Amino acid sequence: MAEYLSNAVQNVALDNPVLFTDSIPCNKGYIYHEDGTGIFILKGCTNNCFARYQVTFNGNIAIPTGGAITPISIAISVLGEPRLTSRAIFTPTVVDEYGNVTSTALITVPKGCCFSIAVRYVDATTDDPTTVPTPTIEVQNANLVIDRVA
């Protein structure tokens, strides 16, 4: 198990990753991450056909001052593509109103391969193309836990 944290408020632009500054890293080398970045590498080191990881993000998100009031969301992305089933949506009523969101995904990495993952600010309004997402959100108390489950 590995845990990655970032307690300070950070502005995250649309389609960009949340950055993680502190870590309790994996001691077996299954997960690679440099503090201060938002990209993680999961390794398919296994005697089986695949390695499986459970990735869970928890954090507080808000629209910064000056932003438009729209639904906001984060999602876990794999190889640069958001897993929309992991999308966590919050709809604030005013700017600077934080909401706690949690997102989880099971990620299967084939033997001998490596997958990159990140937690990204994604468009929460994909169902309504007339709504324009706010360009940035604030993220605070970001916490990412990665467990190797198989």
Briefly describe each language-model feature range.
Residues 1-150:
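Extracellular jelly-roll beta-sandwich "head" domains, especially the C-terminal globular C1q domain
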